[in-house]
């Protein structure tokens, strides 16, 4: 009995020892001593393999280096060829990119770094990861731009590294709590910061503020995880980051859009903007396209044009333009910009920079600003009762523009004199021209002649020439009954002078405005009787008015000269008597007296009316025309 119990105790102790020993076995059944010996053998074999590289490995490395050098040489040659190629398209960046640590650039050191909201001119595609182009800044040369595919891959790698870092840091933190409530907040915060999140930071704050406190910091319970309310709050945030591309395609030349000082369609705003259009046309002659846009291009938001489900909503609304018309106008603007000329839009419906902020146009917004509301109010009232009755609407629009932060505008023209404002705008556009036209790409653009022939609508110098023609016709009609033959002979001498003065004033219009704000603005009286039809006619050169006017005036002049030449030839040919020659002398003396009288009368007429213009309010368009084109 005692022996049997002793044997049982021995078996139990032996079994415990065996279990302890088995704890040190590996997963493959080997013991710890076996694994250590095996690891030593494997380590020795690896050392022996790497310490003696074969000849094939050396030749393979040399081949790789030769291939890399050849690819780099070809990339450099393609980069040089691209310098003279036209711009294929332009993009605005939504992310920032630094090429400092980039090691897979086709030509080392030739990658282009940029910040968010920069503009890039793309010449061509190099491969799936790189484009060839340049940053639109003065002094920046051509280089390699990361493609959207490469930027997306970089973003995914960054997110993956950030998630791994969060995971390892949470494991090493020693927090062994397995409650779902602790995991959910960390997973919410694990999304790494990206450019898309930075852009929509204000939207994110609004969403987080709307979330109740129990969802913002959930308790360790399963209910807070499966709450549909918290899921709904998270979904818009992830949608925003998902659909924000790194680049937005924009026109190759950013179109210039004028806003202010108040609403377009009213005389004060129209006359100031027309003066700037006139200046730009002649200052950048041969380098600028000024076109009128009547469609409501504020409807051309990327979210609307890219989403067919929203088209029906826009079509049913009471908008003045259809989406097809808007899309056509946007395409026309893009086509104009491909010529790399300055593009200026006379957009009837754009009165605020926010109207174009979500479109793909990326315009240069120029704010024509009147700093003092009292000055603007006085200008509106000086335009007559028809404009004064809309005073409140114009003042509210001006106030909304004044409340905008300066960052919404590219240029703010708040000078007191029109000439200074014109020079300010010209300096900005000259700098932009140099930024978009580097010295290395001076070849003519083949798209220029084709596009300008079909798309551009040039602006006439001002409406003044049209108004001058009509006023001149009215003055001619009023004075026609009292005009004698000698006065008809004299007037053609005045008309060529007016035409030459018109040309000189058109070539340098900014020299005509040297007064202060109120005077410089009141000189734009050509828009007193402006209607929609007259605004349309502003884009047609008024050559017909001059041609008809000259035909009417030169006809009697030619008849009179022909009559004189007939008398002289008959006198020379037939040798009339002395009595007849004496009669002709008296007739010529009479004509000379009439010439002097009519010249004196016309001089007094222009001087008197010019003097009246200085002293009066100049409410008629003809007075402003005469003041502009005579005073040089």
Swiss-Prot record:
Basic and acidic residues composition bias: residue spans: 532-569, 582-595
Phosphothreonine: residues carrying this PTM: 526
Region listing for Disordered, in residue ranges: 20-64, 162-233, 460-610
Post-translational events: Regulated through phosphorylation at Thr-526 by CaMK2D.
Entry's Gene Ontology cellular component terms: L-type voltage-gated calcium channel complex; photoreceptor ribbon synapse; presynapse
Annotated GO MF terms: actin filament binding; high voltage-gated calcium channel activity; voltage-gated calcium channel activity involved in AV node cell action potential; voltage-gated calcium channel activity involved in regulation of presynaptic cytosolic calcium levels
Membrane topology: Peripheral membrane protein
Binding partners and assembly: Component of a calcium channel complex consisting of a pore-forming alpha subunit (CACNA1S) and the ancillary subunits CACNB1 or CACNB2, CACNG1 and CACNA2D1. The channel complex contains alpha, beta, gamma and delta subunits in a 1:1:1:1 ratio, i.e. it contains either CACNB1 or CACNB2. Interacts with CACNA1C. Interacts with RRAD; interaction may be involved in beta-adrenergic regulation of heart rate and contractile force. Interaction with RRAD regulates the trafficking of CACNA1C to the cell membrane. Interacts with TMIGD2. Interacts with CAMK2D. Interacts with CBARP. Interacts with CAMK2A.
Functional summary from the UniProt entry: Beta subunit of voltage-dependent calcium channels which contributes to the function of the calcium channel by increasing peak calcium current. Plays a role in shifting voltage dependencies of activation and inactivation of the channel. May modulate G protein inhibition. May contribute to beta-adrenergic augmentation of Ca(2+) influx in cardiomyocytes, thereby regulating increases in heart rate and contractile force. Involved in membrane targeting of the alpha-1 subunit CACNA1C.
Protein name: Voltage-dependent L-type calcium channel subunit beta-2
Organism of this sequence: Oryctolagus cuniculus (Rabbit)
Gene that this sequence comes from: CACNB2
